[in-house]
């Protein structure tokens, strides 16, 4: 599992890339990815292209990111979701909270 935070050149967007299992073991690294950056982004992208697994802990971490980013006003996209990940997000009604692609 690896988590990488990539701020955009203008500092307006933060992309968080997830590689491998996105589960409880990723909690601290995921939190650090958005709390310990030198910018205050307006938009967040969680790139799940290389995520091989996602569990209920990951769903909770996404909700914590949403709270950190402003709750209902947060601009967060969950990008490059596999069909399996999309199914988990749909069952959890996350399409009402996040932009999913």
From Swiss-Prot:
Organism: Pseudomonas aeruginosa (strain UCBPP-PA14)
Location of the STAS domain: 14-101
Cellular localisation: Secreted
Keyword line: Secreted
Main subcellular localisation: secreted
CC annotations in GO: extracellular region
InterPro entries: STAS_dom, STAS_dom_sf
Protein name, UniProt field: STAS-domain containing protein PA14_20770
GO molecular function annotation: anti-sigma factor antagonist activity
Pfam families for this protein: STAS_2
Modification after translation: Phosphorylated on a serine residue, possibly on Ser-56.
Signal peptide positions (record): none
Gene3D superfamilies the record matches: STAS domain
